[in-house]
Amino acid sequence: MIQQITSRVTTYKAHEEVVPEGSTQSHSSLVLKGFAARHQHLAGGKRQITAFHVPGDFMDLHSFLLKKMEDGVGALTPCTVAAVPHSDLREITKNYPYLTRVLWLTTLIDAAVHRTWIMTLGRMDARNRVAHFLCEMHDRLEAVGLTKDHGYDLRITQEELGDAFGLTTVHVNRILQELRGDGLITSRGKSVVINDWERLQKEGQYNPDYLHLSQQIERD
């Protein structure tokens, strides 16, 4: 159904703005290919990344009901994005209870990820935080068929990781070197392989329950 109501598909270049901060949207954007990030900027220009988006993610489903976007979305890599008009989402919520619950679940999982990120930012040290994130990205990418043998392409720079975790690029680089040196991961370019899943999970105190990957929605 969602595929049928997409009004247009747009390809964005890496670092191109997809949804401007403070904008009013008439559609919600669904990632078909590539990586994107949700972010907010401070007056001095500093950026806080509040979410990373992978294929299959709605990046701004909340714009369906919120009149103004307090955050923005930018492409981290070349991205293919489908626009789903809010007028069509309105029709879905009126006439298709099952799909309405699917959309609602999407926003609930998005909120669960945000709550977990708040916990990691507030209560974990930097190494635990990065380990937790590497586990999360593995499971999210595995769910859409983009992993192989505990390996995946992480198309996110160390600067972008720093903007998500409140760390300098130097600190992110040092943590990744430590994880490699301890045999937990292997990384080359944008490729990440998790060599010891159990140890990395323990390092990041990672429990995937908040992703609700096996959540089922009952049909009417």
What are these regions (language model features)?
Residues 51-116:
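Cyclic-nucleotide recognition modules
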Residues 16-78:
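Cyclic nucleotide-binding regulatory domains
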Residues 140-220:
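Phosphate-/nucleic-acid-contacting segments
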Residues 98-166:
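Polybasic "coupling" helices that flank or enter modular domains
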Residues 10, 17, 29, 51, ...:
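Residues that recognize and position ribonucleotide moieties
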Residues 2, 19-22, 146:
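Short loop/turn motifs at secondary-structure junctions and domain boundaries
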Residues 1-14, 68:
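Short proline/glycine- and basic residue-enriched helix-capping loop/turn segments at helix->loop/beta transitions
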